[in-house]
A protein has these predicted regions:
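Active-site core segments that coordinate phosphate-bearing ligands/cofactors
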Residues: 1-155, 164-188, 194-249
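Glycine-rich Rossmann-fold phosphate-binding loop(s) that bind the pyrophosphate
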Residues: 161
Length: 249
């Protein structure tokens, strides 16, 4: 509700420890494709359906920072990552091995060794690996979301604490090939307030409430700027498919 979207051509990522990617629908979708892709239907405000998927989020970088005894802030890790070469590794960030490893850095390094890829070593390389692969993951799931809902998504709203990460926002715009609008960071609290105001006639409806949210907070827009990103997403999808086949052997 705290997401300042309008119309039907937008999706959202609630970006925190975990990422919730989805769209606001009028009716639920309970198809085999939705089941296979692990999307769920949740009741939303005013009879809407939040069609979404819970995927990996900032947990990865939180654990990377913890494993370095918080020597670097999240902003410093992002700055270091921005200076590194992009897309040096492909990682399935939704693999169960990243849910609660003893050491997140070592888990990423082990994954890269096992898959025959360059192993990230420095704090910047590790952070870049995390951010690149989160963005690639978002791109794959946005494709799934569009295929299942039949909607063409032109804008992706990123809300929550993760919306403050400018590097990840730009990487997401590039990988997803859509406009990304980031903010507000406190969308959960704002949404709670907005629903109460709609219920007490502070706003006439949800659409007017969302217009007020848009007018009340600084939002940052990111446009796709990497012409090679879509080819990289396709390579990433091939990598995931190959890893899935190997897991079945």
């Amino acid at each position: 509700v705290g997401t300042p979207g309008a119309g039907e051509d937008w999706a959202y990522i609630s970006s925190g420890t975990w990422s919730l990617m989805g769209a606001e629908l009028k009716d639920g979708i309970a198809t085999p494709a939705a089941y296979d892709a692990n999307f769920t239907n949740e009741w939303g405000v005013a009879g809407s359906i939040r069609f979404l998927k819970n995927i990996m989020g900032m947990w990865l970088i939180q654990e990377v920072a913890r494993m370095q005894d918080y020597q670097y802030s999240y902003a410093e890790l992002a700055d270091m990552a921005a200076k590194e070469a992009p897309y040096q590794q492909f990682v399935n960030v939704n693999d169960d091995r990243f849910l609660n490893p003893a050491n997140m850095i070592e888990e990423f390094q082990a994954y890269c060794r096992e898959t025959g890829q360059k192993v990230p070593e420095t704090p910047g390389e590790i952070a870049r690996c995390v951010y690149d692969n989160l963005a690639l993951c978002y791109a794959v799931e946005l494709k799934n979301l569009q295929a299942i809902t039949g909607r063409k998504i032109n804008k992706l709203h990123i809300v929550g604490g993760g919306s403050n990460n400018r590097l990840l926002n730009q990487l997401t715009a590039d990988a997803c090939n859509v406009t990304v609008e980031a903010g507000p960071g406190e969308a959960t609290a704002i949404g709670n307030l907005v629903v109460q105001m709609v219920a007490t006639s502070g706003f006439g409806d949800l659409a007017s409430a969302r217009k007020a949210v848009r007018a009340s907070f600084d939002l940052h827009t990111y446009e796709p700027s990497n012409p090679d990103a879509q080819a990289i997403v396709e390579e990433y999808e091939t990598f995931l498919a190959n890893q899935c086949q190997l897991a079945r052997v």
